[in-house]
């Protein structure tokens, strides 16, 4: 594996943050400098965490996932007041979801290792599974290539309900069939049987979406020391009760902090992405097997436009009695993470970085400082046959990342023809229509009754010209079919659906192509934190 770094243009908050623009960096509490990380350690030393209770829970949870010895030792290390975490999180996508989930974990592992060495303190990697999420449409699918098209393959749950991913039971037989259908779209390799067995071993131990995700990730990273946490685990929720109470008692200040920070973002020229109602409480409550967002209504806490209503005392009482019924929204999830873990750094994708820029005053409302927010490592895998296609078309390896592949294709095709087809036909249509306009005027003067027919005649002529243009283009494309197929393969591999590879394709394709140790080989590489995109040549 060889790594090539490419500067890919970014926009908005992410671009300015990575370029060191002071205005947007002022929306975060720490710069990404070594001095800032040292200061973060000092700041964390002044806070108290329920470390022993957390260790007890994480030992039980990670042992259940059959964690390796390195993970168990890292969990135990969390009991020491001089141990800190690098953390990232993601929803529990089936088969681990898009590649960027894997890349987030690799980012966490690398940064934890680097900071442990440079700061001289114990730093452990943690991955937060968003078990409270109830939007199944975001986690119940993957993309495959079928009949020369990219298709979204959805796992249709026979018993769908608005429950969280931690509580949504998987039909193992149905899921197994869905997985087999996905693997049928992959080429049969020497690794296919082993990868299917690897996935099925995790599936057999699972009851829910989060179980399956957790088992698969732990199996994939078993020797890395990675600690997994299910954010909606009932035992973890018990530990979070004091902070849920704090949020409920300060929900107005939390909302005010959010709105004030969003005003700052607007003044800097950015568009806020977090949308909330003015009476938001920022906590979900499970009611009748549904996750319901609570809102304020004249001092009462209501859900579903008043269908459910609780007093402050009733809500606090319910939190103490059934903490597993409560969960965070996009605003309070980062706060809960900060409450639970001694967070040296949070690693996020571009979208997360943008919405965290809206949370600074929310953190301050609770008495927290935002942890250093580090953009995750971005990666694209360049297979040998795709590299050959690029070479055959005389394209640079960076071209698909800096240009629209369709545009590259059009430019290449235009260069194969002396005169561009589009321009020639536009010119011809213009000349013919000018002549026809004059002809229509002549017809109208002699016989006005034929004016409508003359207009239809113009339409028919235009139709025939466009038909000729389409046929010519089709024949030209047929003539260059071999080369154009190379463009299609490049687009499917590197920019599927016009998006980055890591936002569409799933890691199982690469395990099937290169073996179960594929992720281990990627982890052996050292990635830079300079904001550049990493292209790994396979």
UniProtKB/Swiss-Prot annotation:
Residues 460-484 form a coiled coil. Its EC number is 6.-.-.-. The gene is bshC. Belongs to the BshC family. Pfam families: CC_BshC (PF24850), Rossmann-like_BshC (PF10079). This is Putative cysteine ligase BshC. Transmembrane segments: none annotated. It comes from Bacillus cereus (strain ZK / E33L). It comes from the Bacteria.
């Amino acid at each position: 594996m060889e790594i090539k770094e490419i500067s890919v243009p970014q926009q908005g908050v992410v671009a300015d943050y990575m370029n060191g623009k002071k205005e947007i960096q002022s929306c975060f509490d720490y710069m990404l400098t070594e001095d800032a990380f040292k200061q973060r350690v000092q700041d964390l030393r002044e806070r108290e965490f329920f470390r022993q209770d957390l260790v007890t829970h994480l030992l039980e949870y990670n042992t259940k996932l059959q964690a390796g010895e390195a993970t168990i030792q890292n969990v135990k290390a969390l009991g020491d007041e001089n141990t800190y975490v690098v953390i990232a999180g993601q929803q529990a996508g089936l088969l681990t979801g898009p590649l960027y989930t894997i890349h987030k974990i690799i980012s966490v592992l690398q940064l934890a290792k680097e900071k442990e060495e440079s700061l001289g303190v114990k730093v452990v990697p943690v991955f937060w599974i968003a078990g409270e999420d109830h939007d199944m449409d975001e986690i119940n699918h993957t993309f495959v290539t079928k009949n020369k098209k990219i298709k979204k393959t959805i796992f249709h749950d026979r018993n769908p309900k608005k429950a969280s991913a931690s509580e949504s039971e998987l039909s193992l037989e149905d899921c197994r069939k869905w997985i087999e259908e996905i693997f049928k779209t992959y080429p049969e390799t020497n690794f296919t049987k082993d990868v299917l067995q690897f996935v099925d071993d995790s599936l057999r131990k699972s009851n829910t979406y989060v179980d399956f995700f957790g088992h698969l990730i732990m199996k994939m990273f078993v020797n890395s020391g990675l600690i997994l946490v299910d954010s909606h685990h009932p035992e973890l929720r018990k530990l979070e009760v004091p902070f849920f109470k704090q949020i409920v008692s300060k929900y107005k200040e939390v909302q005010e902090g959010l709105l004030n920070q969003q005003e700052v973002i607007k003044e800097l020229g950015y568009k806020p992405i977090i949308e909330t109602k003015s009476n938001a409480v920022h906590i979900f409550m499970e009611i009748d097997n549904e996750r319901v967002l609570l809102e304020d209504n004249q001092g009462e806490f209501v859900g579903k436009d008043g269908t459910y209503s609780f007093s402050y005392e009733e809500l606090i009482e319910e939190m103490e009695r059934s903490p597993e019924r409560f969960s965070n929204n996009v605003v309070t999830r980062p706060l809960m993470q900060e409450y639970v873990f001694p967070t040296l750094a949070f690693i996020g994708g571009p979208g997360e970085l943008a919405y965290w820029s809206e949370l600074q005053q929310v953190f301050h409302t609770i008495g927290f400082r935002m942890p250093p927010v580090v953009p995750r490592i971005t990666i694209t895998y360049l297979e040998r046959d795709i590299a050959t296609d690029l070479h055959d078309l005389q394209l640079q390896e960076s071209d698909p990342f800096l240009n629209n592949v369709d545009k590259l294709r059009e430019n290449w095709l235009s260069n194969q023809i002396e005169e561009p087809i589009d321009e020639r036909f536009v010119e011809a249509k213009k000349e013919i229509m000018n002549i026809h306009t004059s002809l229509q005027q002549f017809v109208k003067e002699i016989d006005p009754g034929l004016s409508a027919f003359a207009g239809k005649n113009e339409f028919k002529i235009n139709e025939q010209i466009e038909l000729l243009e389409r046929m010519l283009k089709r024949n030209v494309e047929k003539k260059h079919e071999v080369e154009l197929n190379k463009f299609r393969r490049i687009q499917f591999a590197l920019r599927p659906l016009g998006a980055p590879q890591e936002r569409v394709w799933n890691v199982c394709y690469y395990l099937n192509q290169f073996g179960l140790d594929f992720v281990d080989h990627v982890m052996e590489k050292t990635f830079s934190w300079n904001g550049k995109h990493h292209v790994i040549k396979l």
